[in-house]
């Protein structure tokens, strides 16, 4: 597929360094091994080889979502690909679902959710801070070229949105998600799933304790994902010296109806 003006593009040099661009015919990409006018990239097929002004070769690709989220500008913490994938799987995000997300943050989680729910689903992304909301919206528009119809961005307190949205899934990246857990206990439909991304142990403890106290969340799971690349060169097969360790804890829980002992 050919790349067009406005598309995101990824250039990879001979040492594997990656450069994320938004193609604009009036711009030139410059780096330590020369320059490449964007016009030399526009209209080229992804997978093409490009030569810089000094003769250096670069590989031109359309970026994966993982590339985009790792290279995107950040105004808040980013949910990295190693955590984004498990969130989509363990929270069972599927086409056609309505997902309530908070906060919007960098926009990385919003992008993953949007792709997972597809054109028949809906992501309602809620952010307290207007600057973070604007940054997230810009990231989503940069990836899609516009704000897609299946994403709605709101400014406000997500606890106030649970009842009106009635989400099948709630996904949280907030400093104090336990407040939303309390709201979800009252208003999320039974059978729904709630997921939260938390960097610290105290946040983890408070969120799990709050969920248990409500009496309507079950199958509470806490997971941490670590990623290590491996190097394969002939008979030499070994792990890389560096690995991606702790970035955050992931909590997953399922909403139930109120137990008979609590009714009335």
Give a label for each model feature.
Residues 106-119, 185-186:
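Conserved SAM-binding loop of SAM-dependent methyltransferases across substrates and taxa
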Residues 94-105:
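Conserved class I S-adenosyl-L-methionine
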Residues 126-177:
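S-adenosyl-L-methionine
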Residues 115-122, 190, 217:
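Conserved S-adenosyl-L-methionine
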Residues 181-249:
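C-terminal substrate-binding/active-site "lid" region of AdoMet-derived donor-dependent transferases
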Residues 1, 71-84:
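Conserved SAM-binding loop and adjacent beta-strand
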Residues 1-62:
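N-terminal auxiliary segments of SAM/dcSAM-dependent transferases
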Residues 89-94, 116, 144, 162-164, ...:
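Glycine-rich helix-loop-beta junction characteristic of Rossmann-like nucleotide cofactor-binding loops
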